[in-house]
Amino acid sequence: MPLSRWLRSVGVFLLPAPYWAPRERWLGSLRRPSLVHGYPVLAWHSARCWCQAWTEEPRALCSSLRMNGDQNSDVYAQEKQDFVQHFSQIVRVLTEDEMGHPEIGDAIARLKEVLEYNAIGGKYNRGLTVVVAFRELVEPRKQDADSLQRAWTVGWCVELLQAFFLVADDIMDSSLTRRGQICWYQKPGVGLDAINDANLLEACIYRLLKLYCREQPYYLNLIELFLQSSYQTEIGQTLDLLTAPQGNVDLVRFTEKRYKSIVKYKTAFYSFYLPIAAAMYMAGIDGEKEHANAKKILLEMGEFFQIQDDYLDLFGDPSVTGKIGTDIQDNKCSWLVVQCLQRATPEQYQILKENYGQKEAEKVARVKALYEELDLPAVFLQYEEDSYSHIMALIEQYAAPLPPAVFLGLARKIYKRRK
């Protein structure tokens, strides 16, 4: 009988370790106790695996993953201080041109203002995910000061990409506030000059990658990853705009299939796959299978995240979310309107048709009342539970050979979020 089958017969289930995993990590090193906490471990160096024993079926892994996710949920908080402190170095490096080229001094001053207004003030989840995943995937002895600086910098590149998208998106959506302050384009003296400012934010990504990573073997992979993520997100934004053109409310366009396509391209690739994939490349993990498996988990997380965002746009507290939602006024193909269309009676459909995509406050309120009449908040809460369980199952199935903690920290970070 093969060893793996015998182990399963006695209630021991195997998960592959990361490629670099040292013996002490498989055995539950104090540096990574959560991977094996509470369970007996069987490991041997040549097998490249760590094991957890249960007396129950493999389904127990799902509850174990929830527990380990809880234990790791503060890892983002642990990394946040160093990550945020690195921003001053990012700004300094990006504005050094002023000293060598005084003729562009006022443009560099504008760049500094753009960076400091638009790149900070968020939750930093995307950037921190790069750092957290890097620490999980890279051998501890290789996490020296230089490599950590590169990880922080790549994390900030993800945050700059996010800032670039948000500045442009706020203009297109006529948004009022972002991260608890007025949108950049709404500031006196900015206006549509914000379009160029958004382009500056994007250009900074590639300057930083060149300055910090050009001597690294993964440099080209990172360049291609950021370019591909930008393209995918902009395709998603195009789908979003085409589905809901201004002044033309067509509810027939708002199908679940269309919604999933928008979410996949506009949100999931850059918000979830990009940061984990960047850390994987930095750890030397560039195999197609490993990236494909990670993508299966992360794109599902991205859909989960965007549906939360759509719900919070209307039912969230602006003092908590930091923004005033405008999806109804902007005629957006959101999860709420898709769910409404699936449940509405002919009379309710007519109410939606007459009020959706309109700016008047009373019409917005009528749509919200319709959503509440259809009990969509309860539908969302049930979706949130079901989707989280599905994500846990995907982690169980596809995480290997990466440690599940790479995905669990991110999943726990967004589960039950309210901003």
Curated annotation (Swiss-Prot):
Entry's localization field: Cytoplasm
UniProt activity-regulation remark: Inactivated by interferon-induced RSAD2. This inactivation may result of disruption of lipid rafts at the plasma membrane, and thus have an antiviral effect since many enveloped viruses need lipid rafts to bud efficiently out of the cell.
GO molecular function terms noted in the UniProt entry: (2E,6E)-farnesyl diphosphate synthase activity; dimethylallyltranstransferase activity; metal ion binding; RNA binding
Subunit comment: Homodimer. Interacts with RSAD2. (Microbial infection) Interacts with HTLV-1 protein p13(II).
Enzyme's top EC category: transferase
Associated disease: Porokeratosis 9, multiple types: A form of porokeratosis, a disorder of faulty keratinization characterized by one or more atrophic patches surrounded by a distinctive hyperkeratotic ridgelike border called the cornoid lamella. The keratotic lesions can progress to overt cutaneous neoplasms, typically squamous cell carcinomas. Multiple clinical variants of porokeratosis are recognized, including porokeratosis of Mibelli, linear porokeratosis, disseminated superficial actinic porokeratosis, palmoplantar porokeratosis, and punctate porokeratosis.
Keyword field contains Lipid biosynthesis: yes
Co-factor binding details: Binds 2 Mg(2+) ions per subunit.
Catalytic activity entry: isopentenyl diphosphate + dimethylallyl diphosphate = (2E)-geranyl diphosphate + diphosphate; isopentenyl diphosphate + (2E)-geranyl diphosphate = (2E,6E)-farnesyl diphosphate + diphosphate
Record organism: Homo sapiens (Human)
The protein's name: Farnesyl pyrophosphate synthase
SUPFAM superfamilies registered for this protein in UniProt: Terpenoid synthases (SSF48576)
